[in-house]
Curated annotation (Swiss-Prot):
Gene3D superfamilies: Umud Fragment, subunit A, Winged helix-like DNA-binding domain superfamily/Winged helix DNA-binding domain. This is LexA repressor. Belongs to the peptidase S24 family. Homodimer.
Length: 215
């Protein structure tokens, strides 16, 4: 059994909670802020120590490139055939026309070859984020959100959903009589959707994030 120091265990537990809650790991800056480190460099030192002990894997050049290893009960651990471990080819979805499938050919601007270690689970596509409604969850305008197609999501997960003619990224919160789509920015209002609404459709859950300049 791998023995971690108390501080390393705190970092490891924080990473695991972040993945379970939002679908992707925290940045070095977020780890430092949460655990009271003096700087992101201190978080980086603990991450490298965890990587040396074989409990996480780090992807070079990506602030969220952290993957948990060796967890038999971890639903977020990425498992792929050996031939797929080198890279994933993911379509990048730009603007989505009303009434047409997200992965319709006209929405795909290009494909990216991605390291699987960037993601908490195998994604199906990348969605270019527009706006700052999820800013406080670390999701910014222009980011590429990795999305796994799902018909259902757990309470608290960050989701991609259709709402009328729009596609939106929000945190899902179940409420009596429906669901609330939570914005992670006080400048934006939350959206309540009644159960059975024909205007609402879940498209998938967030499983990772790529920021231009870090890719």
């Amino acid at each position: 059994m791998i023995k971690l120091t108390a501080r390393q265990q705190q970092v490891f537990d924080l990473i695991r909670r972040a993945i379970e809650r939002s679908g992707f790991p925290p940045t070095r800056a977020e780890i430092a802020a949460e655990l009271g480190f003096s700087s992101p460099n201190a978080a980086e030192e603990h991450l490298r120590a965890l990587a040396r002990k074989g409990v996480i894997e780090l992807a070079a050049g990506a602030s969220r490139g952290i993957r948990l290893l060796g967890l038999d009960d971890a639903p977020h651990q990425l498992t792929l055939p050996h031939a797929a471990l080198m890279q994933l080819s993911l379509p990048l979805v730009g603007r989505v026309a009303a009434g047409s499938p997200i992965l319709a050919q006209e929405h795909i601007s290009q494909h990216y070859a991605c390291d699987p270690a960037l993601f908490s689970s195998k994604p199906d596509y990348l969605l270019k984020v527009r706006g700052l409604s999820m800013r406080d969850a670390g999701i910014l305008d222009g980011d590429l959100l990795a999305v796994q197609k799902r018909a259902e999501a757990k309470d608290g997960q960050i989701i991609v959903a259709r709402l009328g003619d729009d596609v939106t990224v929000k945190r899902l919160k179940r409420r009596p009589g429906g669901v609330e789509l939570i914005a992670e920015n006080p400048d934006y209002e939350n959206i309540f959707v009644k159960a059975g609404s024909a205007e609402f459709a879940l498209e998938g859950i967030a499983v990772g994030l790529i920021r231009p300049g870090e890719f």
